[in-house]
Curated annotation (Swiss-Prot):
Catalyzes the attachment of threonine to tRNA(Thr) in a two-step reaction: L-threonine is first activated by ATP to form Thr-AMP and then transferred to the acceptor end of tRNA(Thr). Also edits incorrectly charged L-seryl-tRNA(Thr). Homodimer. It comes from Chlamydia trachomatis serovar L2 (strain ATCC VR-902B / DSM 19102 / 434/Bu). This is Threonine--tRNA ligase. Its EC number is 6.1.1.3. Zn(2+) binds at residues 328, 379, 505. It is found in: Cytoplasm.
Amino acid sequence: MIHVTCNQEAFELPEGASAMDLANKMKQSHCFVGALINDQEKDLSTTLQDGDTVLFLTWDDPKGREIFLHTSAHILAQAVLRLWPSAQPTIGPVIDQGFYYDFANLSISEEDFPAIEAMAKTIAEEKFPISRQVFPDKEAALAYFSQNPFKAELIAELPEEVEISAYTQGEFLDLCRGPHLPSTAPVKAFKLLRTSSAYWKGDPSRESLIRIYGVSFPTTKELKEHLHQLEEAKKRDHRVLGTKLDLFSQQTCSAGMPFFHPRGMVVWNALVDYWKRLHQRAGYQQIQTPQLMNRELWEISGHWENYKENMYTLTVDEEDYAIKPMNCPGCMLYYKTQLHSYREFPLRIAEIGHVHRHELSGALSGLMRVRTFHQDDAHVFLTPEQVEEETLNILNLVSELYGTFGLEYHLELSTRPEQGTIGSDDLWELATEALKRALVKSQKPFIISPGEGAFYGPKIDIHVKDAINRTWQCGTIQLDMFLPERFDLKYTNAQGEKSTPIMLHRALFGSIERFLGILIEHFKGRFPLWLSPEHVRIITVADRHEARAQELAKHFSQMGIIVSVDSSNESVSKKIRNAQNMQVNYMITIGDKELETHLLAVRTRDNRVLNDIAVEQFSHVILEELRSLSLTPSL
């Protein structure tokens, strides 16, 4: 007999029992898609060992959902091969919104989707058991996939000692690490979304492939809800709204590097000004470090060795330089400009740094995935004893910032990876427990992702939920035990000795560009007044009303209200529609009556009309709405 633990409960099982046997014993096997066995993702068919700790995964768990979608990608490949036997499957990973599979020697269009979906449904209904097999060696794997040069190339690149596995469902076998569902049966709702071209390994010099995107769910109801969400997402697409509202544009001369227009810069500046006020109140000092620094710096930080392919490099005066992809190394150099004592800690240093990272052209997407962006970093230097309290301070800052935008969020604690980490076991345990205690004290929901931390320390990721319930990973809090050592940072401790500080690296917006894209979609372009690129538009009925309109515009502008005048020859109704299409918060119409009474006729973008409003009253209401950072209109 063996003894295992699941949900802090002990179970006794016969030798050779699998995770599925344990699930059956718990009478919940129908709910489970996979398992974490000693923090490692495994199939339910995995044989358990004495002393194992098991955590079952369901569709509702992020890792469980990945397993479900991964199996769905295999179903897609199997369906395509049944219909087009000469197609060559390459890779089929899980992505944020579903999965895709790339094929060579295949030419299809979306007109073929119904046939593929019908075949996928058949495969699911056939309830094929999914089994894992391990090749005895690399030669055996290469021999099996000798007719597929893409799979053979992947196998050839693997180290000799790596276990090479494949998964079988019915007649289909695919090279894969897994894990997978126990069978194809749970995939009851399957939908293909689109196709695109792709290059093998993202390299334009390599073979051209066709990529098929899809989603899947355990129930038809969930699929319908998801498709409805996708339709709503199309209406909110920040790339479309960004153009319509004249916020930003993309130019072919600089792919992945957006041009912000005057209206977009108003929103940008409102975000940055708010960020600066928030951080000044929280005790942060702001710095600015260069964008261009030499190779020596990036060798110390480790970027030159491990990240160079994502950096823009150049040679100046026969010396190698790189445009910074991250702000951290520059802050390390700033720290070293002065001597430091434990009495200064926590030392909070913030920077909105302009960074550049080379992304493949196929990965670029509006403001969400770019090659240049501004990261709102901060580095907090502290002693090990201060980690918990300072993490809680940062979490409170997170709550205030996202609350200002009406955004809900959840937190994810990623713990120590199995291999390749730095730092002692004791320091990792101290750091992880400190972050965990801070999360508990914050009273915000969080999940733990075992083994998903960085090599230099545990981290907390912040996942924001928008108006249509999509989640976006924005901010992060990372405990870094690596860079302070690499840069030989020191402080004088309470005993008068030199010590290396612990560093909390955190970003709240993450990327300002990406956060702005999220806000455009969250608000559907209808920004609250304090973020709006145009607070008020004054509309004239006739030419004789323009002088009064300009007088009012000057009055409002001097108060800090962003205002414009539309004295064009368009009809009043057309001017109002134009303003509403541009999501102007308030419109003021000036006609003969308003000219005579000096009162205002105000219309909101939701078409609420308020007549005979005094200028002073309107000004007071608007200024208070701006000051309070209100998310709802005051009129």
